């Protein structure tokens, strides 16, 4: 499988979550759904600015929106970030193993001196 295709979801998710406001929106939506206007007010930004953030999160599948009358409601999207969590865990384990090996080397050096 092509690397670009294989990691497309990861790229979109990590790019979407690279912004503090967008991470804050996801954290807020974990607790409760909210309208775009409510989110804009909560994060002290314009409606237009918040719509742009929501669009990025929506393209990544992290947020879903639905028009309810004149209000656009936001909720967590269909993606559960399992692929992202698995990728992070794989690298966390690799770094743990490397640090454990380094600890062993340092302990050997300490014992020798």
Indicate where each model-derived feature is located.
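Beta-hairpin "wing" of winged helix-turn-helix
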Residues: 58-69, 73-75
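A cross-family signal for key residues in well-ordered alpha-helices
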Residues: 15, 27, 58, 64, ...
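N-terminal helix-turn-helix DNA-binding core of bacterial DNA-binding proteins
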Residues: 2-48, 71-86
